Amino acid sequence: MESKDKSLPKKQRTVVAKIANVLSYILVSLLLLIILVFLFLQTPPGQNFIRGKVQTYLQNKLHTKVLIGKMDISFPNSITLKNVYIEDQTKDTLISGGQLKVQLNMLKLLTNEVQIKEINLENITAKIKRVNQDTVFNFQFIVNAFMSNQKDSSSVHDSSTLKMNIDNIVLNNARIIYQDVITGDDMNMFITHMDAPIKKFDPDHLYFDIPTFTLTGLKGYYYQNEPLKPKIDSAIAVAILKPENSLKIRNSEILLKDIDIDYKSVPTNITTYLKLNKLTAHPDTLDVKSLKFAFKDIALDSSDIALEMGPTKKVQKTATQLQVKEVLSSFSISAKDIAITKSHFKLDNSSMPVTHYGMDYGHLDIQNLDLTAGNLLYNLDTTMASIKKASFTEKSGFVLNELNTDFLFTNTGTSLKNLYIKTPGTILRRDL
């Protein structure tokens, strides 16, 4: 019995063969074209072509000036943007300079997953501001531009939930400028290095697990000016009186090195200068919802802390402020172990007169402070700790060789149990 192929006329077989050949040529050509396009996009001219398209798209989308100096795509692992500049709607700088490198699995994007291994920012300046009472932050137009697309698409079809995960965030030589006229905040900070590996990233529920947080070379200032009262009261009430909106953070270790910042609060008339050589802390619980922060241990080494205080005006509190104060009454900080070595503490309270004899407790200058303590608890009406060892020298000439006691300060009184004080000429033991 003859095969079906042999049963076909010769002319018909020739036509089928020609069609098959044409289709094979088309498929091979398409495959080669895809390969050539892919290879082209890996070349500098190809990536410059993409850079131009992305830059034009963002400018048309945001209706503001957007510049991207260079784009480097290493498929399928990373995207790097260099010399980025984005203006806000007032033609002031929003983001500028440096390099943004994102290491991610691009193939996961096809399954609606954003798996980011690391976000690395270098030599970046970000300026965030809200300069008028009835305006929003200067980055809000970006949120609005992209959120509008999500609203339009959701009305057409219900897409699957986007899964997002970030494993690590690194900052190198970054400056953050923050100004908010409503809250009165004015901040300008430079970060030499920050490393924040993330074990759990859940922005929908505001839950973040950051096992180790490292910050090196933080320098700058944070000023708190007089806020716009009605606005700030409302903002605080939303943040504090609605605990379901609270941030949830889990952390095992905090490492701070080479910190030099100035803090000034106009409402409280307090100025603080912090120069921390090294601070290490191991949190046990960071409960933002209940305002309770517990640490296993805190260690401060070779640091300078200066505190300036002045008289404050008594202001009649609003009902909202009183309600917030009641919630804040649960605020507490505790630590099982505290260690301070080779540090300097200075206090200058201008509301207290200067004393020219003995130790002036309103104008202290303590050098070579070494302190070991345990069971520290601080809240709005109680301070307590067990001082195991303490020594320092003070500008008045007073020298403390050794101190240990269990102290308790409350709104109703003070107690010092198992008090032991040793100076060059005195030894004191008693309970107060």
Provide a role label for each language-model segment.
Residues T43, L67-V136, S148, S154-E226, ...:
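Flexible beta-edge/linker motif
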Residues Q47, D92, K395-V399, T423-I427:
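Solvent-exposed loop/turn segments connecting transmembrane beta-strands
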Residues G52, A385-K389:
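Short Pro/Gly-enriched beta-strand edge/turn motifs at strand-loop
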Residues D134-Q140, P227-S234, T312-A319, G358:
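Flexible, surface-exposed loop regions and adjacent strand-edge segments
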